[in-house]
Amino acid sequence: MNMFSSCMITALVILTLPIIMSSTKLYKNKLYPYYVKTATSYAFMISMIPTMMFIYSGQETIFSNWHWMTIQTMKLSMSFKLNYFSMIFVPVALFVTWSIMEFSMWYMHSDPYINRFFKYLLLFLITMMVLVTANNMFQLFIGWEGVGIMSFLLIGWWYGRTDANTAALQAVLYNRIGDVGFIMTMAWFLLNLNTWDLQQIFITTNDNFNLPLLGLLLAATGKSAQFGLHPWLPSAMEGPTPVSALLHSSTMVVAGVFLLIRFHPLMEHNQTIQTLTLCLGAITTLFTAICALTQNDIKEIVSFSTSSQLGLMMVTIGINQPYLAFLHICTHAFCKAMLFMCSGSVIHSLNDEQDIRKMGGLFKVLPFTTTSLIIGSLALTGMPFLTGFYSKDLIIESANTSNTNAWALLITLVATSLTAAYSTRIMFFALLGQPRFSPMILINENNPLLINSIKRLLIGSVFAGYIISHSITPTTIPQMTMPHYLKMTALAVTILGFILALELNLTTQGLKFNYPSNYFKFSSLLGYYPTIMHRLTPKTSLTISQKSASMLLDSIWLENILPKSISYFQMKSSTLISNQKGLIKLYFLSFMLTMILSLLILNYHE
């Protein structure tokens, strides 16, 4: 057992070596990215030892060996929880990151600050490892905030671009909203249970956990880009493609779902929170799938697809299947990271062109990338015996056989069908058909850094689902029995999506709209959500502020109180006081009459 924990710690410590190295002269070395990639690959290989031990023994462990501080009666110590979730997630994250780092060496080779880029990627990976192995909420919060700040730095990597800066700020602001929920939960546990240790929280028999669980759901909504706090994820595509592949597909965005999986002992008997999670996930998965249908930017489509899959994971947690949600996290990481890397390969080859309308015919010039992209898309849609099938098929079956909300189930099935539709659209427009890009572009994918990294994830996208689902069973799962039509639902829905997408792609190629349809506008403008939230709300508040500040105060009160009131009172008083009308003849006549009368009176008086 000592070997189990020490191997795991060794794997995590190896990752910190290049960070320490960055304070020496080696940081200026051109080989620094290579050191980082090698450290990650060694960490992955060493982390496989405890994972294999765990698979065969099934023994979870917690070790707490560094007392940090005591707050009144609560002891804060650094403790790691190596259970099913962290033991499987760590090797998956390390494997995906290793491939992405190798890909980055090709993609970012001309960047002058490539060493800093690799250091950021590694720091992100370390904070992610802290998050998944944490045994108390404080340590989990450190990892949670760590991935948030690294996300900000990496999205805004090209800080000379306004869009990148805006997207980075947007990601931070949306995540702050989620963090409010996390901090509220931490405060509740501190006040009511006087502990942040996960074991102590789980063994308490407090019936009313609604408030902290709502806080956790808000935190997960922010981090995992669920409906309401979702716009930051598509905007995050402004970052370099390796960042999109690592943070916004396989690791960081699943942190919110991972948080709910960690706290599932509190959620499993709470009907209210489960229903909320189910409905939120169902709305997200459908809404983002609809948005993905009409996008033209290849990275935007893949990012909306990520958001849709996160919604599906939330649905799985909502039907009380945390282990299944976790399996989907692991299988999704492989195919989604590969999809982003293939997109990056296409974008780089076409001189940074991201519009799928300006691609086409790439299967002839980029055969390896095309093959990988098609296999990744099929794995994502749940093609039988590829990675995605093992989790996605089970999720649909579990939803079909559980006493769930019929509305949520229906829209989840529709979203699953749409997954096939937008995946077909990418394949159809970007890879097949006639070339629509400039013939002057030189295309070359024969770089070992690119080929090897995608190849590893390609193998993962084919076999990982089978390996993870068959060699690692959390508990003895009883064999499910269900009618044939229910068993085939997931597959039927996916095939329906494929057929519809192909039919629509082929029939609408020559069609031209005289005016855009409202449905099309709804999808391409992302359901008007950014327009309303990012434009209408600030504009309304600014207009009201301006009206109250300038119109109400300046134009009305200040003018009326001082200049206008003074002149008004002056005019009134002068009008009242002076009866001078300027009639000289009349005044002279009255003066003469008065004089004559007075003289006459004086004369007669004598």
Curated annotation (Swiss-Prot):
Family annotation (InterPro entries): NADH_DH_su5_C, NADHpl_OxRdtase_5_subgr, ND/Mrp_TM, NU5C-like, Proton_antipo_N
GO molecular function: NADH dehydrogenase (ubiquinone) activity
Membrane-protein topology: Multi-pass membrane protein
Pfam family, one: Proton_antipo_N
Database matches in NCBIfam families: NDH_I_L (TIGR01974)
Organism: Canis lupus familiaris
Known function: Core subunit of the mitochondrial membrane respiratory chain NADH dehydrogenase (Complex I) which catalyzes electron transfer from NADH through the respiratory chain, using ubiquinone as an electron acceptor. Essential for the catalytic activity and assembly of complex I.
Family statement: Belongs to the complex I subunit 5 family.
Keywords: Electron transport, Membrane, Mitochondrion, Mitochondrion inner membrane, NAD, Respiratory chain, Translocase, Transmembrane, Transmembrane helix, Transport, Ubiquinone
GO BP terms in the entry: electron transport coupled proton transport; mitochondrial electron transport, NADH to ubiquinone; mitochondrial respiratory chain complex I assembly
Keyword Transmembrane helix: yes
Subcellular location as annotated: Mitochondrion inner membrane
Bilayer-spanning residue ranges: 1-21, 43-63, 87-107, 117-137, 140-160, 171-191, 201-221, 241-261, 273-293, 310-330, 365-385, 409-429, 457-477, 488-508, 582-602
GO cellular component, one term: respiratory chain complex I
Catalyzed reactions per annotation: a ubiquinone + NADH + 5 H(+)(in) = a ubiquinol + NAD(+) + 4 H(+)(out)
Protein name: NADH-ubiquinone oxidoreductase chain 5
Enzyme class: translocase
Name of the gene encoding the protein in the UniProt record: MT-ND5
Keyword Transmembrane helix: yes
The protein's assembly and partners: Core subunit of respiratory chain NADH dehydrogenase (Complex I) which is composed of 45 different subunits.
Domain of life: Eukaryota
Enzyme Commission (EC) number: 7.1.1.2
